[in-house]
Amino acid sequence: MELFGHSIDHEPALNIFSYSTKKETYRIVDEALYKTNSISSYIIGFNNRNSILLNNEHPLFQSIKGVGNSPKETKEGYTEYHFYGTYLVGPLLVRNPDFLKFFVRELIHFKQPDFKIKKVSLKLEEQAHQEFMKNYYSEYVV
């Protein structure tokens, strides 16, 4: 994600988007729970990095638990013009089946708006997401 911004530690990056990144002397290592306007379910993932994102006007997620783009911020990731960038590792799409469905729909409909997507069962992935939420974030399970 960092490469697509304006700069990394004041060195030029690709400058596709207006954000910049700064390397830090500390590491951010934590489990994270996020929300997004794109889907109703929670996003789960894991952070392991030593940089922060600055000047983010188009966040992808809102942090519920865990670190956002920086330790003092609740915004995380970046989305604009069909670009989705995040610091989360996970694997993100496998651990979040509703976000996977959203992402695949967006990807396909961007190129072929009339394409009919065949329904695919993600029952095991959905069960894994529910179990993780129940085991680690039970206060957010309805």
Where are these regions (language model features)?
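Hydrophobic/aromatic beta-strand patches that form the interior of the parallel beta-sheet core
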Residues: 15, 46, 84-86
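Fold-independent oxyanion-binding glycine-rich loops
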Residues: 7, 19, 48-51, 88
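Short, acidic Gly/Pro/Ser/Thr-rich loop/turn segments
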Residues: 21-24, 52-55, 91-95
